[in-house]
Amino acid sequence: MANLPTVLVTGASGRTGQIVYKKLKEGSDKFVAKGLVRSAQGKEKIGGEADVFIGDITDADSINPAFQGIDALVILTSAVPKMKPGFDPTKGGRPEFIFEDGQYPEQVDWIGQKNQIDAAKVAGVKHIVVVGSMGGTNPDHPLNKLGNGNILVWKRKAEQYLADSGTPYTIIRAGGLLDKEGGVRELLVGKDDELLQTDTKTVPRADVAEVCIQALLFEEAKNKAFDLGSKPEGTSTPTKDFKALFSQVTSRF
């Protein structure tokens, strides 16, 4: 049996990370899966296996064990805003969002991603896939206002660091994430947030996860960055040829 590449997915207990970890495990003829989560609860949530490591991406030393001997990295960590306590929907208005101490986008999406990219370089990783978000071309995007976190600004900074790192990469800037079935839509790639002006600016998490897995399999996905959206289910032929999808992408950032 050939030596299979070992793939580490970070943020493996998150909503999209869980799907990627599961797909890697199911693809055991192609990959050896490893996961990185922040807590023991996160580890239990995805099955508690020995291939799941616990570490804090904002603390470089704590994540090093997970990076030993890996060939590829899929980054699915992200700062997550929490609704400020005390919001009463019956009174109208909008809820306020805050980030917990130590979990601001600057720490998680910039320093945390930089730590992962650096650890991957030391490990000799041959490919890094990162899932980001559409909207990064607009500094005034509403997502940047959440908790005054400037989340897209910091994600973009980490993406630029990755693109400049010398390690082959794929940057997937997903549209609005849907908790819907994967594999039943035509997927669309774009650049510079053009898809945000269309009705194809959302994409199921399961499809984002599949694109992460497929990116590991095709040279055509390397050193490219793209936005990812989808056509509504039932309106066109579901994407099956990922080599062709990646071949449409010409942008390096």
Curated annotation (Swiss-Prot):
Pfam families, alphabetized: NAD_binding_10 (PF13460)
Keyword field contains ATP-binding: no
InterPro entries registered for this protein in UniProt: NAD(P)-bd_dom, NAD(P)-bd_dom_sf, SARED1-like
Top-level taxon of the source organism: Eukaryota
Acetylation is among the record's keywords: yes
PTM sites of type N-acetylalanine: A2
Keywords: Acetylation
Any one of the GO CC terms: plant-type vacuole
Cross-referenced CDD domains: SDR_a5 (cd05243)
One function term, GO molecular function aspect: oxidoreductase activity
Listed transmembrane segments: none
SUPFAM superfamilies the record matches: NAD(P)-binding Rossmann-fold domains
Biological process according to GO: response to abscisic acid
UniProt family annotation: Belongs to the NAD(P)-dependent epimerase/dehydratase family.
Record text on subunit structure and interactions: Homodimer.
Protein name per UniProt: Uncharacterized protein At5g02240
